[in-house]
């Protein structure tokens, strides 16, 4: 026998009791997201989910994402309640552009020291995002890793699986000359461009919490949760012939629209069809950012762009607006062999 101190996992910086307390805190809100296809509850080694029986040839669609350095801004401002919505939105919006209905979602939360209140706030936001998109939060991983993260700093990642009928996959192959492009308004910068946002804040020397923009703090504009378009877009897909959908994330207009365009087509965007929300004007002015760089980095007020036949454009816009979206004609598709896939004029 020796007189050495007996060490525990907690002595090493990992508090299993805190992790268990977190699970107890979130059980109720997670249960609210449950779908009928989900089998079992939290706590299993894996989550089980049956395929909805309405699909004849179901195709699974998967996606994973994070929220980038918007998370750093949220941590600096100690505002954790909506970052979970952002996390879900970035995943489910990527699924729905292919026509997929999100089925279930999992999250990964890693931190240097687990703060149960902060983690519960984030996961409550994740559950809210799942409710907005109709998918079940079936599980996740909370990793307390002392030495890997500074103090209570944390990172999050999300993973989502959806399903689409094989014959109804939206892949852009039907896009053709004369299609109309319909825009869906964003709620702000969503979850992209925040390294530039934070650089602009640093260079300009402003305090986002005390700087007023349109009657509310700049921080409110910058941390507005990413809009989730799933239910509106699925209703649209069921009503009109949608040819393609682009989710405007990293890379902005220049990189995301071409991802859904067939060869020998070009998207013409009418810059006069909408006004940038004030937060983008502030960012451009405060950072002296060029117009081209703005369209490359930010969504500039446009969260999604939908291509569909011109004859169905008015019906689509009316349906989307009835669902609470702000939709408008933003441009059209023309035949072109130009290497410039997107023109903003």
Curated annotation (Swiss-Prot):
Main localization category: cytoplasm
Catalytic reaction equation(s): 2-formamido-N(1)-(5-O-phospho-beta-D-ribosyl)acetamidine + ATP = 5-amino-1-(5-phospho-beta-D-ribosyl)imidazole + ADP + phosphate + H(+)
Matching InterPro entries: PurM-like_C_dom (IPR010918), PurM-like_C_sf (IPR036676), PurM-like_N (IPR016188), PurM-like_N_sf (IPR036921), PurM_cligase (IPR004733)
Gene Ontology MF, one: phosphoribosylformylglycinamidine cyclo-ligase activity
GO biological process, one term: 'de novo' IMP biosynthetic process
EC number, UniProt record: 6.3.3.1
A Pfam family recorded for this sequence: AIRS
Alphabetic keyword roster: ATP-binding, Cytoplasm, Ligase, Nucleotide-binding, Purine biosynthesis
Gene Ontology CC terms, in alphabetical order: cytosol
Spans through the membrane: none
UniProt keyword 4Fe-4S, yes or no: no
UniProt similarity note: Belongs to the AIR synthase family.
Name recorded for this polypeptide: Phosphoribosylformylglycinamidine cyclo-ligase
Gene name per UniProt: purM
